[in-house]
């Protein structure tokens, strides 16, 4: 009985603590390719919705083996004022991405939201909560 309990405890600890999370907030020579790829995917999605080209001030970009969490501020590439709807809360952007067969895909992305839409998202997608810190 003790062996079964020990084995279960060990499996739970591996699944909980086995995820390595890396911050890509700052661009370095080692993370430039992946960081740029993730940000380009977010830019393309925002362009479809807002027809404006954006660059990001990255506040958080945490990456695990399967997921990436982004929080940042969108700024127009031409440095003009961002055009949004009257009810939008400019200019913050948050997004969850998933890596599938080596490619990143957007799972959830919200720009200029007026609420904390991502509360509990870690439970919805079974993502380590540490990714969001």
For each feature predicted by the language model, list its residue ranges.
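Positively charged n-region of N-terminal signal peptides that target proteins for export
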Residues: 1-4
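Short, non-transmembrane alpha-helical segments in secretory-pathway proteins
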Residues: 25-53
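Mature extracytoplasmic domains of secretory-pathway proteins
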Residues: 49-101
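Short beta-strand edge/turn micro-motifs at domain boundaries
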Residues: 92-121
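Extended, polar beta-sheet/loop recognition surfaces of beta-rich domains
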Residues: 120-133
């Amino acid at each position: 009985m003790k062996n079964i309990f020990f084995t279960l405890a060990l499996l739970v600890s591996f699944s909980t603590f086995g995820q390595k999370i890396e911050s890509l907030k700052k661009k370095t020579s080692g993370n430039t390719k992946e960081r740029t790829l993730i940000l380009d995917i977010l830019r393309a999605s925002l362009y479809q919705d807002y027809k404006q080209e954006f660059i990001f001030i990255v506040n958080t970009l945490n990456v695990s083996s399967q997921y990436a969490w982004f929080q940042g501020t969108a700024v127009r590439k031409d440095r003009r004022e961002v055009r949004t709807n009257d009810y939008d809360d400019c200019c913050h952007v948050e997004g969850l991405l998933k890596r599938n067969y080596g490619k990143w895909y957007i799972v959830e992305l919200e720009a200029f939201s007026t609420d904390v839409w991502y509360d509990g998202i870690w439970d919805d997608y079974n993502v380590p909560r540490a990714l969001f810190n």
